[in-house]
């Protein structure tokens, strides 16, 4: 159990505070809920307010979400900058407003042909590996003048986001499928899928009579990238480079730094529909996150030491080396006496209708005697 007991003394006696828990939870976020929904579930399970997460996942996405509580929330700033690994499915041949299956399909013509797997992999190696420039979708959590970009986009306002540099360490194609899907909605099931290195001749012509269907190509990929990379933007840009359009239909984060979805202490969760009445008196149904083992959440947590070791770079040293480091640090610490500031005696200006006299006071008293020197209205006398 991860807890510490703190006590404080007062005039009344010794007061015992409630145990303070600190640590990290690696949660497998379910589809259909936000990252904030998961944080709310952890708050309820631990009965704590000080809970946060590192790296937001879209509602459509699943996978690793690192949640910190107590003093361990300080580690989240380090974790959010770690590189990440994703498994994703990119659908080529259709575009959406959000660059994923949550958005609306944008109008477009059928693709007359589709590239082979080899051609796609060559383009990825040339244009989408290493350091690249990426423009996030307007339906993102990026702030523009203090407001979230997705809020502005939903209000119908024009949002222009600047390109940002990101690093793609790995962009591997695991499988390629050709098939057709409904042309009136995003994320529809792929029908007649064929796993192949390239599309067969006459394949598109065979589905032409089905007016409500559209030929598409799907890629199952693995991407390892720097913090701040949008995988749906990769799907969009890859589709544009191929002249087909593209969007994301599946996204799963499998790793954040040293935190992996395959760790033995990963905590699972699921989405649960809940209906409630809002302030306007209307019934609203939405999903919420529910931890599968909420009563034993602390059993899945990493303690502060293990959390720090997984969050930051560590150097193992022996007991003697640790003692030497402490001794060296103490020897370098010197006390510097603060400098005493010497205040100068102020100069007091006395004004009259026809003369200005400056008198600097001595230690005993201020001199207010008029000057023996007569000056015009543009001169002054200072007595020291």
Predicted regions and their residues:
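Residue-level signal for inorganic ion chemistry
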Residues: 67, 88, 146, 234, ...
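Non-catalytic interaction surface on structured domains
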Residues: 124-128, 132-145, 149-232, 237-244, ...
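Accessory RNA 3′-end/elbow-binding domains used by RNA modification enzymes
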Residues: 2-30, 36-53, 57, 123, ...
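Glycine/acidic-rich beta-strand-loop module
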Residues: 50-80, 138-139
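Acidic, low-complexity central loop/insert segments
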Residues: 72, 78-136
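Active-site-proximal helix-loop elements at catalytic-domain edges
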Residues: 6, 16-38, 91-117, 159-164, ...
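Short glycine-/polar-rich loops that comprise or flank the Walker A/P-loop
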Residues: 22, 62, 83-86
